[in-house]
Amino acid sequence: MGRIISPDALILVAVMTQLRDLEIARLFGWYRIPLKTAPKVIAVDYLAFYQTGSFGADKWRIQYIAQVKGHELTTRAELLQDQPDHPRVNEEYYKVQIGSLQELLPPIPAGKWRRITFFYTTGEYLQDAETVNDLIVHSEDRQILWTALRERLDKEQTYGIGDQPEVELEDEVLAALLGIQGQ
């Protein structure tokens, strides 16, 4: 992808620590963020994935982005069912549904940066970036970014899932679906 993205797109730079996480994103279309370390706003337009040192020759760069389709709160146990003994198995995570991974050509190298946490940027900065440092929103544009983030935080993001049919359920069926016992 030649970095053609709307200049006003809101982008969350997210940390991808393991190749397995990249494969989950590519094959299953989701990315996980621990609730206790999550940024305040998850309802963004895109995720840009910063690859850590565990990626070998592809380390310390942003090589992929993906459009955000929605998000939900769940547990690590639900997300990674093959890890029932993990120390954080019962902790809450955001499961961010994403579209297909789009490769950035060329990728955006970290430059001098190595340790990165979540941060926000815009499509305009992504298009022009030569290094990760170039993604940092400058003071003159920071107010625009914070206003966009506040707007996303103040109202729930809609992800364009289209019209959903209304379904009428009997009280017993609804109670069963919600796990509510009869009184």
Name what the model sees in each region.
Residues 2-183:
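Structured alpha/beta reader/binder surfaces that contact nucleic acids or chromatin modification marks
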